[in-house]
Amino acid sequence: MKLHRYRGNPILRPNPLNEWEALNVFNCGVIHHNGLFHMFYRAQGTDYVSRIGYAVGADGYNFNRLQQPILFPQEPFESRGVEDPRVTHLGEEGRFVMAYTAFSLGGITPMFAESTNLIAWRRIGPLVTGEDNKDHVLFPRKIGGRYAAFHRRPPSIWIAYSDDLRHWGDFQVVMGPRSEEWDSKRVGGGGVPIETEHGWLAPYHGFDHEHTYRFGVCLLDLEDPARVIARPSGFIMEPQELWELRGEVPRAIFSAANPVVDGTVYVYYGGADRVIGLASCALAELLEFARRG
């Protein structure tokens, strides 16, 4: 089973008219809300400082973008950039939570911010400090009465829990690399996990010793997502197109978004840290692959 690339890829490119996004646009979070696709993308200008831009579209392929970033470095710990946004809609609470990586010369910090309108964001705080930790994403509902989030302590995917999104604990490893496989060096979370009757469908990325990124998927227990139910040996996508193979980071495809609309999974991804592409598949097909593949 493989994802199907959109023929019009890439769907978002750098905009030379705006300095803050003139060099690279990539690694985006996307949600579908009120009939629209809302995209939050990482952008870089010639200063290589990452900022987060916003774009919106009705069909999932064509987007109109704001001319100014909606999130940019303001704190010392994010002086070199705010990166790789993943956005979760907490529908029962009427708010959205963005997980993003703050970068400074002092290291990286996995941060959370919240919004009620998708444009104005208020920082909540970090998942953890003082360690190399990123690729975090919030689950779309509480599990056992607590918020849950994936994160990455290299080289593995971990999970953590919180009562208030500010204080995190109960850290548990979910899964790590597999020797001699496509995900042999490290793994990291993808977009927001998808709840199904068979478990949490969790797309993720893997990285091998030849420095190639690929996408995979696993199935996790609904009430204990640290328990892996199934993890196929094969991947669902690898770099093939020229713009996926050549760029700021060669052979890199990186997804932080997989919204489901009318039974279709839309997988948005950065291509070689330069542009944004889209691939898709039927949710039923992806779930079957995760269970049986």
Model-derived features: where do they sit?
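Beta-rich carbohydrate-recognition and catalytic domains
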Residues: 1-80, 89-185, 194-251, 261-265, ...
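Acidic-residue sensor for enzyme active/binding pockets
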Residues: 83
